[in-house]
């Protein structure tokens, strides 16, 4: 009985602490940085530049571990400014510190309008048309026309504007810089995976808005 009482009391104490926002918090966050798994093209370029030991290790579960990362320059980390015990000056590292509602709106802007719907649409058609790189798809005028219509014509009129990022400028960067980037090789096959599970959130919100 004594042990049970202690266990129950301890659990209730932990629960009460978790519910006390003056002591502990669980800030919302949104991150946007396209980072595919290490690509052979990048590895070959690094080796060509006389950088050694660039060959990735592939685990038994087909996880790639490499000394380099395929990553793009644009990056957005939006965090709810809710730290009851203080925090470092994350703004100095480019982090957007804001309220929970703005974090949520930024996520909705990206996922339902300005990036993910474009990415998914072009990837599905890219797979059907035999493309293996997103940047190569961006040389196809029909695919570019498709994502521009999705973003600018259908998306922008109903976009959720978070206030800290301007939706049109965000799409401009996606279409003009991020997707055409040949130095960040990404496969439409990766993006198109599980598309059936993504349709609702990536296209449904825009449809509902109309």
Pin down the residues of each PLM region.
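Single conserved hydrophobic/aromatic residue that forms the stacking wall/gate
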Residues: 1-9, 13-16
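Catalytic cofactor-binding cores of redox enzymes
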Residues: 6, 25-26, 118
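General secondary-structure edge motif
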Residues: 8, 54, 101, 187-190
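Domain-level detector for long, ordered catalytic/regulatory cores in large eukaryotic signaling
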Residues: 17-22, 27-28
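Glycine-rich beta-alpha junction loops
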Residues: 28-34
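A conserved active-site cap/scaffold subdomain adjacent to cofactor or substrate pockets
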Residues: 39-163
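C-terminal catalytic subdomain
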Residues: 125-210
């Amino acid at each position: 009985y004594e042990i049970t009482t202690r266990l129950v009391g301890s659990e209730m104490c932990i629960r009460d602490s978790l519910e006390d926002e003056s002591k502990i918090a669980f800030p919302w966050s949104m991150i946007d940085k396209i980072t595919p798994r290490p690509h052979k093209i990048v590895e070959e370029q690094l080796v060509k530049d006389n950088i050694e030991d660039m060959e990735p290790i592939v685990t038994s579960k087909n996880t790639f571990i490499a000394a380099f990362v395929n990553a793009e320059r644009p990056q957005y980390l939006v965090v709810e400014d809710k730290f009851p015990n203080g925090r470092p000056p994350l703004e100095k590292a480019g982090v957007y510190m804001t309220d929970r509602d703005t974090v949520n709106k930024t996520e909705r802007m990206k996922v339902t309008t300005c990036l993910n719907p474009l990415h998914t649409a072009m990837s599905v058609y890219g797979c059907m048309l035999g493309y293996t790189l997103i940047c190569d798809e961006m040389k196809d005028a029909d695919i570019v026309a498709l994502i521009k219509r999705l973003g600018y014509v259908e998306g922008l009129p109903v976009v959720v504007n978070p206030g800290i990022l301007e939706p049109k400028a965000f799409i401009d960067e996606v279409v003009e810089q991020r997707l055409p980037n040949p130095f960040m090789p990404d496969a439409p096959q990766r993006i198109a995976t599980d598309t059936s599970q993504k349709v609702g959130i990536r296209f449904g919100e825009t449809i509902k808005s109309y």
